[in-house]
Amino acid sequence: MKLVLIRHGQSEWNKLNLFTGWHDVDLSEEGVVEAMTAGKRIKEAGLEFDVAFTSVLTRAIKTLNYVLEESDQMWVPVNKSWRLNERHYGALQGLNKQETAEKYGADQVQKWRRSYDTLPPLLEENDERQAKNDRRYQLLDTHAIPSGENLKVTLERVIPYWMDTIAPEIKEGRRVVIAAHGNSLRALVKFLEGISDDEIMELEIPTGVPLVYELNDDLKPVNKYYLDK
């Protein structure tokens, strides 16, 4: 069984080196090219899908659309869930990463970005950036909407969705592609591979490059590789 993961192509805020999180930004021109290239590589590799999953953020949705279009699979059903969203960067969202490092220190910012269990500064309740003000989240329990997340909290929302919704599809023999985000995919990879809390800090997933897992019957990886050529 194969599972394909794709981090969205470069976004406009990736290009500007800004913390993005749940803020909804579009793909950059380079990001569009990355997504289209990913779809072409998937087609060349002969990978076919029966069902697709993505977040409710534009950059991941568009990446998936380009991938399916370029691989001639636009008909594949797509499921969108906030549980596959990027990690919520709290009050850091919209800030420049370099300027934030200069203000708070590179070590502190590195902990906010990469530590498994260090939370970023949280959004204030009345902050206009709160996701509860966004129509796509208005049907959610307000207690489920974060004001900021670390990777641990991100994993705690991603893995139940994997277990309850995605994994059963794979066990039924359906071929799955997931287009999501750097940290929601890091959370899933941590779970699949059993990566330690310390080791996950070093894991980087490149934008727009398909990551293919070969899984056994227990959905444990027996092989993985990037379609980067």
From Swiss-Prot:
Enzymatic reactions: (2R)-2-phosphoglycerate = (2R)-3-phosphoglycerate
InterPro entries referenced in this protein's UniProt entry, alphabetically: His_Pase_superF_clade-1 (IPR013078), His_PPase_superfam (IPR029033), PG/BPGM_mutase_AS (IPR001345), Phosphogly_mut1 (IPR005952)
EC identifiers of the protein: 5.4.2.11
User: Where in the chain is the site Transition state stabilizer?
Assistant: 181
Give GO terms: molecular function aspect only. Answer: phosphoglycerate mutase activity
Pathway noted in the entry: Carbohydrate degradation; glycolysis; pyruvate from D-glyceraldehyde 3-phosphate: step 3/5
GO BP: any one term = glycolytic process
Q: Does the keyword DNA damage apply?
A: no
Q: Where does substrate bind?
A: 7-14, 20-21, 59, 86-89, 97, 113-114, 182-183
Instruction: Please list the residues that make up the active site.
Output: 8 (tele-phosphohistidine intermediate), 86 (proton donor/acceptor)
CDD domains the UniProt entry points to: HP_PGM_like
Going by the record, the broad EC class of this enzyme is isomerase
Q: Which PROSITE patterns match?
A: PG_MUTASE
- For this UniProt record, give its keywords in alphabetical order, as a comma-separated list: Gluconeogenesis, Glycolysis, Isomerase
The family this protein is said to belong to: Belongs to the phosphoglycerate mutase family. BPG-dependent PGAM subfamily.
What does it do? Catalyzes the interconversion of 2-phosphoglycerate and 3-phosphoglycerate.
Q: What is this protein called?
A: 2,3-bisphosphoglycerate-dependent phosphoglycerate mutase
Task: Look up and give the organism this protein is from.
Answer: Listeria welshimeri serovar 6b (strain ATCC 35897 / DSM 20650 / CCUG 15529 / CIP 8149 / NCTC 11857 / SLCC 5334 / V8)
